[in-house]
């Protein structure tokens, strides 16, 4: 299949620039794979799609305020660093702008010298490995100096940075939010749990590759980025029990899906506690192992995320659902509306 097979025209005004006042006031397009029918609802009605005994699986990663603005001591040249992943100790892989000024040994100062980065290695595409020096606790320094790394298609400043975190965000490490989870409130989750649905959490730290468009024509030539995931023994045991009892595993978002399916492939359909790096690319033709239904936001044309949805719902039904969403003026991308596919 070709990348062009997953293209569609999206009017720019449908790209949501800010979150809605209430998280669960967003809209929900319910897509039934067996009948091919669509139903326009509000997000809080997702509880009606869940049955007692089902498991709702969510990614509890927390977004780091990973964008740092600093300057080179001596020259005063402005430098932007975007933290991608912690490689070891105080060393991080970062994306640097402008990268050409940052050779090995170069230093960047942030917040009047409260934080200093020294380049220890050069990578391709503007990537660098830097070592940070600071006083105190790194995450606290980052919280005070860093900014939220909002996606490139969001041009408005975020009034409240907690709105780019899920209400259950816990494990620090993402460069982007698992946005399908942004719609849930604590109250809605309590109602879902009271219905007899098991709430299960895993962790996948979302990398920047999630926004990277597919640059090759043939999908077989596309190389996925790697992201770190963890599924605990307790979570795995709950999911095994849910499956054994004939109930559904329902994933919230593509990051939860990629974690579950990575584990399903690794253990041949079984669900075991595991952690490691995944670069799974789910596209049409994929044999599903674990996930029975899922919620997700509306994604970018030609993105690997539209391909993942197409692998579950079929390309034709997926593009038809997107056509419907555009005609009905649904809001797209990170702060946009959601779909539930069953």
From Swiss-Prot:
Keywords: Cytoplasm, Queuosine biosynthesis, S-adenosyl-L-methionine, Transferase. InterPro entries: QueA (IPR003699), QueA_dom1 (IPR042118), QueA_dom2 (IPR042119), QueA_sf (IPR036100). GO terms for cellular component: cytoplasm. It catalyses: 7-aminomethyl-7-carbaguanosine(34) in tRNA + S-adenosyl-L-methionine = epoxyqueuosine(34) in tRNA + adenine + L-methionine + 2 H(+). Belongs to the QueA family. Its EC number is 2.4.99.17. This is S-adenosylmethionine:tRNA ribosyltransferase-isomerase. Monomer. Its main location: cytoplasm. The lineage of its organism: Bacteria, Bacillati, Bacillota, Bacilli, Lactobacillales. It is found in: Cytoplasm. It comes from Streptococcus gordonii (strain Challis / ATCC 35105 / BCRC 15272 / CH1 / DL1 / V288). Disruption phenotype: The arcA transcript in QueA-deficient strains is 14-fold more abundant than in the wild-type strain. However, no significant difference in arginine deiminase (AD) activity (encoded by arcA) is detected between the wild-type and QueA-deficient strains. The growth rate of a QueA-deficient strain does not differ significantly from that of the wild-type strain, but the QueA-deficient strain does not compete well with the wild-type during serial passage. The gene is queA. GO terms for molecular function: S-adenosylmethionine:tRNA ribosyltransferase-isomerase activity. One of its GO terms (biological process) is queuosine biosynthetic process. Induction: Is constitutively expressed in the different growth phases. Its transcription is not subject to carbon catabolite repression (CCR), and is not affected by arginine or low pH. Is cotranscribed with arcR. SUPFAM superfamilies: QueA-like. Pathway: tRNA modification; tRNA-queuosine biosynthesis. Pfam families: Queuosine_synth. Transfers and isomerizes the ribose moiety from AdoMet to the 7-aminomethyl group of 7-deazaguanine (preQ1-tRNA) to give epoxyqueuosine (oQ-tRNA). Seems to have a role in modulation of ADS (arginine deiminase system) gene expression, perhaps exerting a negative effect on the translation of arc regulatory proteins. NCBIfam families: PRK00147.1 (NF001140), queA (TIGR00113).
């Amino acid at each position: 299949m070709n990348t062009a097979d997953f293209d569609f025209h999206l009017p720019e005004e449908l790209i949501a620039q800010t979150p809605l006042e209430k998280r669960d006031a967003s809209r929900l397009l319910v897509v039934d794979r067996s009948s091919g029918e669509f139903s326009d609802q509000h997000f809080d009605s997702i509880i009606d799609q869940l049955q007692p005994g089902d498991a709702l699986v969510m990614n509890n990663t927390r977004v780091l305020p990973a964008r740092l603005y600093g300057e080179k001591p001596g020259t005063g040249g402005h430098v932007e660093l975007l933290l991608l992943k912690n490689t070891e100790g105080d060393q991080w892989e970062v994306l640097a702008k402008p990268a050409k000024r940052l050779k090995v040994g170069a230093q960047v100062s942030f917040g009047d010298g409260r934080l200093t980065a020294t380049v220890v290695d050069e990578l391709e595409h503007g990537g660098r490995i830097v070592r940070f020096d600071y006083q105190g606790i790194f995450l606290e320094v980052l919280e005070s100096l860093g900014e939220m790394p909002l996606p490139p298609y969001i041009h408005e400043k975020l009034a409240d940075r907690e709105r780019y975190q899920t209400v259950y965000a816990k494990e620090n490490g993402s460069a982007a939010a698992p946005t399908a989870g942004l719609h849930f409130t604590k109250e809605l989750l309590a109602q879902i749990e009271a219905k007899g649905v098991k709430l299960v959490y895993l962790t996948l730290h979302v990398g920047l590759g999630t926004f990277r468009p597919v640059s090759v024509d043939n999908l077989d030539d596309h190389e996925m980025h790697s992201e770190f995931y963890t599924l605990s023994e307790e979570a795995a045991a709950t999911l095994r029990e849910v499956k054994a009892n004939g109930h559904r595993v329902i994933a919230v978002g593509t990051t939860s899906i990629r974690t579950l399916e990575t584990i399903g492939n690794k253990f041949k359909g079984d669900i075991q506690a595991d952690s490691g790096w995944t670069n799974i690319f789910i596209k049409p033709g994929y044999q599903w192992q674990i996930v029975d239904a899922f919620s997700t936001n509306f994604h970018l044309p030609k993105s690997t995320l539209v391909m993942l949805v197409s692998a579950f719902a079929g390309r034709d039904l997926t593009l038809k659902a997107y056509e419907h969403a555009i005609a009905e003026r649904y809001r797209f991308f990170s702060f946009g509306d959601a779909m539930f596919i069953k």
